[in-house]
Structure formats: C-alpha cells, structure tokens
Curated annotation (Swiss-Prot):
Residues 10-156 form the N-acetyltransferase domain. Coiled coil: none annotated. The keyword Transferase applies. PROSITE patterns: GNAT. Its EC number is 2.3.1.-. Gene3D superfamilies: 3.40.630.30. InterPro entries: Acyl_CoA_acyltransferase, Bact_Acetyltransf, GNAT_dom. The keyword Transferase applies. GO terms for molecular function: acyltransferase activity, transferring groups other than amino-acyl groups. CDD domains: NAT_SF (cd04301). This is Uncharacterized N-acetyltransferase Mb2688.
Amino acid sequence: MTDADELAAVAARTFPLACPPAVAPEHIASFVDANLSSARFAEYLTDPRRAILTARHDGRIVGYAMLIRGDDRDVELSKLYLLPGYHGTGAAAALMHKVLATAADWGALRVWLGVNQKNQRAQRFYAKTGFKINGTRTFRLGAHHENDYVMVRELV
C-alpha cells in the first residue's frame, strides 16, 4: 500500500468525524471521492506548494496534516486528522508541532485554518495550540454551506 493509499484510507475514516451530524452521508462520500482519494493524495504529495505530514504507529499512518503555501507569507493548515483511537494520545500535539515547524521553515508569518463552528473539540485543540478566531467563512459540502471559523496563529 502506498502512502497515498494509506492517506486516503485514513481520510475516509476521519473526515466524516469532523462533519456536523446533519450532513448527509452521500455528500460526505462525494467530497471524500473528489478530494481525498488515493489519486488526489498522489497529486498532493508531488505538489511543491503542499506538505503532507504524518503521524505513524508501527509504521502505519494513523493521522495526517496538509499545509498549503499561499502567495503571501501565510500558510493554510488545510487538514489535520487522526484516527479516533489516537485521540488523546499526544499524537495531535506532535503533529501540530511538525505543522508549525514546517510553516516556520517555509518562512511563514502565520498559519491559518478553517474549522466548523459546531466542531468544539477541534476548536479547543486549536485554541490550546495558540490559534485564535479571526473571522468566518463558508465551506460547501454537498448541497449545504457549512459555517467555519477562521483561526490564525502568528509565528513571529
């Protein structure tokens, strides 16, 4: 199994956990197929504007984060997901440490992310790691428009 295959398998299990309960399973599946497939991860892994960082256990990918360089000195933390069995183990904090170090190595001034306004667990984690709410945005998922908070962490 390639890293792209493993990442797609983890994404298929973890992305639905971050979605509000009202989102229809077919909309989640459609998003996963379009954006989190093995083929898409193969593209992401070769894209010089992206970095995919992994959390591993016994050599297997159990979580990942994806960073995207902007045209300015901002970096988007596009995704950060862990398999449920690894929540509360310190794996997310270790992955976030890699995220911030990579962004700093790229010369970023700040890292930003979007998190669903109903995902309080993720919001608490991001706040604990220094992110602050800086605005809102909408995220289309199927026929629905979900409301996200934009959270930012300054690096300098």
